[in-house]
């Protein structure tokens, strides 16, 4: 995977997620090795979607979001792994819980 693949994947996934989830998105953040710049050919593109919906409500969009992931994989060497996090949960945990803290401190904001 190259930086061009990462740029393509993050741009296309962000555009598609914004269309799918519309006004429910608070932030989209790329995190992990691609955000830090220490990715390799086996890395995936980790993306957190911070949303105003609870986990159960956002599940109804999984199929459309997975279609975006599949389209990206078919058109590049990038594999996107995403997670949807409720904004209240994210804000409560980003200061102390390791996973959320890494997203907050190492992440690259893609959409707000």
Q: Residue locations for each model-derived region?
A:
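Catalytic core of pol beta-like nucleotidyltransferases
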Residues: 1-27, 36-41, 52-112
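Recognition helix of helix-turn-helix/homeodomain-like DNA-binding domains
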Residues: 33
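Short beta-strand->loop micro-motif that forms the acidic, two-metal-ion catalytic signature
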Residues: 46-49
């Amino acid at each position: 995977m190259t930086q061009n693949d990462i740029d393509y994947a993050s741009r296309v996934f962000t555009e598609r997620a914004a269309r799918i989830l519309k006004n429910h998105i608070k932030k989209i953040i790329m995190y992990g090795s691609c955000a830090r710049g220490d990715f390799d050919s086996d890395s995936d593109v980790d993306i957190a979607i911070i949303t105003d919906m609870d986990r159960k409500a956002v599940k109804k969009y999984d199929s459309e979001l997975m279609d975006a992931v599949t389209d990206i994989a078919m058109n590049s060497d990038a594999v996107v792994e995403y997670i949807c996090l409720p904004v209240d949960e994210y804000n409560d945990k980003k200061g102390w819980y390791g996973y959320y803290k890494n997203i907050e401190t190492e992440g690259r904001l893609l959409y707000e």
